Structure formats: structure tokens, C-alpha cells
From Swiss-Prot:
NCBIfam families: GSH_gloB
Cofactor binding remark: Binds 2 Zn(2+) ions per subunit.
InterPro entries tied to this protein: Clx_II_MBL, Glyoxalase_II_hydrolase, HAGH_C, Hydroxyacylglutathione_Hdrlase, Metallo-B-lactamas, RibonucZ/Hydroxyglut_hydro
EC code: 3.1.2.6
Name the record gives this protein: Hydroxyacylglutathione hydrolase
Family the entry assigns: Belongs to the metallo-beta-lactamase superfamily. Glyoxalase II family.
Stretches the record annotates as Disordered: 224-245
Cofactor requirement: Zn(2+)
Binding residue positions for Zn(2+) 1: H56, H58, H112, D133
Keywords, ordered alphabetically: Hydrolase, Metal-binding, Zinc
GO molecular function, a single term: metal ion binding
Subunit structure: Monomer.
GO biological process: methylglyoxal catabolic process to D-lactate via S-lactoyl-glutathione
Length: 259
């Protein structure tokens, strides 16, 4: 049985730790800081860290890799197209890897960074997606390296996964993302309900993740660029007609950057 733990780091990062209760092995995703992982391992001394999965090269995702590898000898797997410290296995689009007995498929999702990847585990009951800084709950990552067209294509690719997919992103941005989503679609009842729920959760210091792809399709404006209400708001913001979904996305992203 696999349990997934969220280890908070910095102001709003989550390091995801997957624990196999039967084998007493574990894996972490995007350890920007070694300390929370080492603390968890100290509290669970019978569990051995076997693998470190990396989605992209930003320091808040890789800052703890070297220390963790030195402490545990864990294998480091990360995108081939980026410089990842202490990487043992370079991963490219469509590659398959197995950790804790779970097979993951690598999806190249450029936009936030050019070499960004996501890890997808296909499962009839509960598919899993570790999306890094590409797809957030109710939002998406900033475009530090890629183009709006690249990010839109990456999000469309992830949106094609099963609706039941559970989404484990790397930051607690849900509340601010939902406030933006409500500005885009003020009449969207699903957004209003989710905003109320997450406001309560965060007031009680509860995590708002994981999300699901079905929920994102109802409440995430960056996955709703084909909706008339979203396009109309994007056109209003950009002062003209956005003639493609990619252009709608670009308008929304530029707005969100200043929101």
C-alpha cells in the first residue's frame, strides 16, 4: 500500500513523499530543501529513501537533492534537457520508470521551464500526476522560459488524462488562484463553491491538495480557454479578439501575472 505525504517547505512548497508500507521504502518528488525529508526519515527510521524524482531545475525543487543523496544514496531521476544536480537517470518524453512498484510515464510539459517534465501513474482506480509547477490547483505556472503556446499545449496534454487523475502540484497557491478564477468567471458556481471550501481549509491550516482533473476542468481558467465566458473576459482584458485558445491562454496568463 502506498501512502502519499505532503512535507511543507519554505513558504508554500510541498515536497511529496510516497511511502510503501509493505517494503518500507519511500520516494520524494522535488525536494527543494533536504531538512523536511531528513526529519521525516528520522521519525520513520525503518523507511529507506530509494529515489528522488525531479520535475525541473529551479532551486526550490532541487536545493535538497545533493544532501539527500549523500545521506541516503538515493537514485536521482530528472529531466534530460535541464541541469539537475547529482542526477543519475536523465528522463525524456514518454520514458517509463518504476519506483515502489509503480510505473510512471514521463510527460514533457515545457512552459514554466523548457525542460519541465511531469510524472503520470496510470491506475484504473486512482491515476496520479505529479505536475511540478506546470498545472496548479486552479492555476498554472509562470512562463519563465517557455512561450504561451508551449504552456497551453502542455496543459492541453495534461487535460487529456483521465478526469479521475489526482493532481499533486508543488505549491499551495490554490486560494490566490481561485480568487483569480473568480475574477475571470464571476458567475461560475463551481469556482464560488471551491473558493469557499479552500478558504475554510486554509483558515484551519489544512492542505488544499491533491486536486482532481475533473475539478480543474470546472474551476481552472487555464483549462477552460474554449469556454465562451472565459474567451469574452480574455478579449475584454486584451482589448481585442483572441482568435485561438492559445491566444486566450496568453491573455489570461498576462493578466494573472499582474493580478
Amino acid at each position: 500500500m502506498i501512502q502519499i505525504h505532503a512535507l511543507p517547505a519554505f513558504n508554500d512548497n510541498y515536497i511529496w513523499l510516497l511511502q510503501d508500507l509493505s517494503s518500507q521504502q519511500c520516494v520524494v518528488v522535488d525536494p527543494g530543501d533536504a531538512a523536511p525529508v531528513l526529519e521525516w526519515l528520522a521519525q520513520n527510521p525503518h523507511c529507506r529513501l530509494t529515489d528522488i524524482l525531479i520535475t525541473h531545475h529551479h532551486n526550490d525543487h532541487v536545493g535538497g537533492v545533493v544532501e539527500l543523496k549523500q545521506a541516503t544514496r538515493a537514485r536521482v531521476l530528472g529531466p534530460a534537457a535541464e541541469s539537475i544536480p547529482a542526477r543519475d537517470v536523465a528522463l525524456a518524453d514518454h520514458d517509463r520508470l518504476t519506483v515502489l512498484g509503480l510505473e510512471f510515464v514521463v510527460h514533457a510539459v515545457p512552459g514554466h521551464t523548457l525542460g519541465h517534465i511531469a510524472f503520470y501513474h496510470e491506475d484504473a482506480a486512482a491515476p496520479l500526476l505529479f505536475s511540478g509547477d506546470t498545472l496548479f490547483a486552479a492555476g498554472c505556472g509562470r512562463l519563465f522560459e517557455g512561450t504561451p503556446g508551449q504552456m497551453h499545449a502542455s496543459l492541453e496534454r495534461l487535460a487529456a488524462l483521465p478526469d479521475s487523475t489526482l493532481i499533486y502540484c508543488a505549491h499551495e497557491y490554490t486560494l490566490s488562484n481561485l480568487r483569480f478564477a473568480q475574477a475571470v468567471e464571476p458567475d461560475n458556481q463551481d469556482i464560488a463553491e471551491r473558493l469557499a471550501q479552500v478558504t475554510l481549509m486554509r483558515s484551519e491550516n489544512r492542505i488544499s491538495l491533491p486536486s482532481s482533473l475533473a475539478l480543474e476542468k470546472r474551476t481552472n481558467p487555464f483549462l477552460r480557454t474554449r469556454e465562451t465566458s472565459v474567451k469574452e473576459k480574455a478579449d475584454e482584458r486584451s482589448g481585442g479578439q483572441n482568435t485561438s485558445q492559445s491566444a486566450v491562454f496568453a491573455s489570461l496568463r498576462a493578466w494573472k501575472d499582474k493580478f
